[in-house]
Amino acid sequence: MSKIAEKTKMHRRTAWQIQKDLEKDNTIWGYTAVIDEQKIDRVIYVLQFKTKHLTKHFADLIIQRLTTEQPVEKGVRILDIYFMNGLYDVFIKYSAPDHAIARNYYETLRSIYRDYILETQLLSDVNFSLVQGGKVNPELKKIYDLVPKITPE
């Protein structure tokens, strides 16, 4: 908080009070570290799918599932979930230690939300994170590792 106060030319107490007010009305919530999932032997997966219209029952099911932390019990770590407008309605970014666990989570979601998910689903694994949590990857140049090596014939 001292650095923020210094950069904004405020007193620390004023900056602290603004932070508390923003926390109180949930303008800001949760303080997290950005984790390189690959360095802890996990793979990031992105699941996108279309849904039927949102109903109260569907919303209740989503809230119940997210507040019981059931995915954690299965070895899955939820990174982000968005309800969107566009080609897909739901975007879920999660990590798992292997493809079998990731696929099992995907199948579990399909089963739980079977009355709401339309057939279009897209499951991808992430090769490299360029920006995560609003932070540019400090090892950004590792993207060059993905460039195919061309060997002369």
Q: Model regions: which residues?
A:
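A compositional/biophysical signature of low hydrophobicity enriched in polar/charged and small residues
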Residues: 1-153
